[in-house]
Amino acid sequence: MTAVSAAREISFRILAKVDAGGYASDLLRGETVALESRDAALAETLVLGCLRYQSQLDFLIAHFAGRPQPKLDLEVRIALRLGIFQLRYLDRVPAHAAVAESVELVKGARKRSAAGFVNAVLRKVNRAPVGWPDRATELSIPAWMLERWELHYGPAVARGIAEAALAEPVAYVNPATGRRQDIGAQSIVPLLEIKPGMTVLDLCAAPGNKTAQAIAAGARVTACDRYPRRLAEVPAEAARLVLDAAEPLPFSTRGETARFDRILIDAPCSGTGTLAGNPEIKWRLQPSDLFRFQARQRKMIERALPHLRPGGLLVYATCSLEMEENEAVVEGFPVLATHSRIPGRDSGDGFFAAAMREGR
């Protein structure tokens, strides 16, 4: 019996949890903390690689199994994805380890009857080029998502976005805060044009990277979020406040509405600009979700604008590439300018932002 390495066992477990609705980055952070750095790095490579290339891997399962769209239990499919990813996409993993440990993972998941099938399929895997059946499989992206990007951005930019989602994200550090922060995310707070001493309301502030940027620019920040646990990550220099999504913003006393010089709405969104680091979004998101996000996002702007001082500036931002969450959300509001970053065209994640001025 072959022993399964900690990295592969944890990867197998995390991928099953992601399929059940978990988030890969959170699960990796929690489950690899006790591993040696080499094993933790391998687990991250396996989990994120299998998610990034999921549709290619599923096509390759059928290709090497000699069956179109074989019906497989989840545990068997995950073991095959892990095995094929190691055999075709990684260079320094011994083939015998990739095959033998994938077989043992299936046995350990009480799918012993499928062990022979997994072994037979993985032993056929080679690195010969295959003909992908369509662009969506080639780029490992849902067809509906690729098609809408092609319509909105054009085929070349859409391909660049999809290819960027297959790459490992580059780690950036914000020199003003010393925090790890994507280069695209760093571009949002400067749109607020903060001057020292200004008051800033940062809605949806966790994990606090943009809050830290505003503080570094000299602002006095009130940082808000719905989740107390996440709000704990926000810099202590900010006034921190937990919001109830069903209640109005709690900034009015004795009939007086509190106002801020600047408001940042870093809105919850689909996250399609962050697929390189959060590849499970590709397989989880549905077109109808965009309209659900849109309704919440417009409501956030409507609730926040009354708290902006006359002449103040509000910046609405998402890490989405979708019109429904961006241009369509800010339509009808007093927009001064918009800003966008597109993966493949620009470094880092994708973002949209719109600056609005309150003239009352």
Predicted regions and their residues:
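S-adenosylmethionine
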Residues: M1-R360
